[in-house]
Amino acid sequence: MILACDVGLKRIGIAALLNGVILPLEAILRHNRNQASRDLSDLLREKNIQVLVVGKPNESYADTNARIEHFIKLVDFKGEIVFINEDNSSIEAYENLEHLGRKNKRLATKDGRLDSLSACRILERYCQQVLKKD
């Protein structure tokens, strides 16, 4: 199975590719980086993940890229790690919330649903860029 994550300072959005369908999973709430990396490691083990797709912004965001790379090094994972450009994935995910009212959009932003929808976009890009080549 393939899992994608959108690493943020407060939450880590999670999405999985299951039988050709991309599904958002419950986001990991990040209290500190060690707890969050442990939670992600546990999830990768529980779901028997072979490929972890990680969203990263373009090179002009050097600090963010360094933070994401450092976090991923803390994750206990022996499978393949693929970095995919995440530019605008959060904006695209937010546009997917058009059907929600303003209050529910705010709640989706706070509880991690938006982050997991962003992880879905990252996983879609992985499927388009990497899996199509095979």
Swiss-Prot record:
Function in brief: Could be a nuclease involved in processing of the 5'-end of pre-16S rRNA.
Family, as annotated: Belongs to the YqgF nuclease family.
Keywords assigned by UniProt, alphabetized: Cytoplasm, Hydrolase, Nuclease, Ribosome biogenesis
Gene3D superfamilies the UniProt entry points to: YqgF/RNase H-like domain
GO cellular component terms, A-Z: cytosol
Organism name: Helicobacter pylori (strain G27)
Any single GO BP term: rRNA 5'-end processing
Keyword Nuclease applies: yes
Protein name, as recorded: Putative pre-16S rRNA nuclease
Stored SMART domains: YqgFc
Protein location: Cytoplasm
UniProt EC number: 3.1.-.-
Signal sequence bounds: none
MF terms (GO), sorted A to Z: nuclease activity
Matching InterPro entries: RNaseH-like_sf, YqgF, YqgF/RNaseH-like_dom, YqgF/RNaseH-like_dom_sf
